[in-house]
């Protein structure tokens, strides 16, 4: 019997926050990881920058960098840039969600949100 589960990109857990399944395809794990790293950097700013402004700027910068790298390689794929940007945003917001739930004591093992 073969395993028919679809593998998705997961944000690693920490302390009181279990891993979070982003729903993004596993091939986009790199984008999810970069988004989570950016979220950690935003948290270190301790409110100096509004979350919405930070997320919008970082997602745009990520997409711009990815598109530039594709142009250098001579193979721009607009769809791939778009889904990678969405995975990046899922990583960023997912990490913020993990911190929010942990701070509120809302540790969950719901299969749709955790892995």
At which residue positions do the language-model features occur?
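Alpha-helical oligomerization interfaces
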Residues: 31, 35, 39-41, 61, ...
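Short terminal alpha-helical segments
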Residues: 2-43
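Intrinsically disordered, low-complexity, compositionally biased regions/tails
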Residues: 17, 27, 39, 51, ...
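Amphipathic alpha-helical binding modules
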Residues: 75-115
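Acidic, low-complexity, intrinsically disordered interaction modules
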Residues: 45-90
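N-terminal regions of proteins, emphasizing targeting and processing segments when present
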Residues: 10, 14-15, 36, 41, ...
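Short intrinsically disordered terminal tails
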Residues: 1-8, 23, 104-115
């Amino acid at each position: 019997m073969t395993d028919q589960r679809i593998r998705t990109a997961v944000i690693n857990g920490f302390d009181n926050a279990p891993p979070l399944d982003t729903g993004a395809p596993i091939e986009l794990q790199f984008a999810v990881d970069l988004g989570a790293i950016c979220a950690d950097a935003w948290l270190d700013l301790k409110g100096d920058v509004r979350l919405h402004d930070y997320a919008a700027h970082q997602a745009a910068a990520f997409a711009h960098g990815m598109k530039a790298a594709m142009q250098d390689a001579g193979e721009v794929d607009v769809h791939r840039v778009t889904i990678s940007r969405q995975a990046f945003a899922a990583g960023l917001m997912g990490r913020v969600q993990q911190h929010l739930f942990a701070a509120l004591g809302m540790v969950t093992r719901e299969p749709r949100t955790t892995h």
